[in-house]
């Protein structure tokens, strides 16, 4: 099954280097729910914040979920499962 998800890496241009865009979660204005993350989003010195974003390469280079650090991957998949279960 193909994930309804795009992952971007801005190569460290900002502290929230990675962005996960949840394509199954469309916001009212046509943007998507997303998660911006540093390399260590669950640590006290890390960053992980939900927001909304337009999908596209302005977020960085598209990468596969397997290219994310393990902590980021776990967080993204936890969100993804919750989004998909909400949609029934």
Q: Where on the chain are the PLM-derived regions?
A:
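Weak global preference for isoleucine
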Residues: 7, 63-65, 83
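A short beta-strand-loop micro-motif that forms or neighbors metal/cofactor-
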Residues: 76-88
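Acidic, low-complexity, intrinsically disordered interaction modules
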Residues: 13-74
């Amino acid at each position: 099954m193909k994930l309804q998800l795009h992952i971007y890496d801005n190569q460290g241009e900002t502290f929230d280097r990675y962005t996960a865009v949840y394509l199954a979660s469309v916001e009212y204005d046509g943007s998507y729910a997303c998660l911006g993350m540093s390399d260590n989003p669950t640590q006290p010195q890390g960053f992980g914040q939900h927001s909304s974003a337009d999908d596209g390469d302005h977020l960085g280079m598209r990468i596969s979920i397997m290219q994310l650090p393990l902590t980021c991957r776990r967080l993204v998949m936890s969100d993804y499962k919750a989004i998909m279960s909400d949609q029934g």
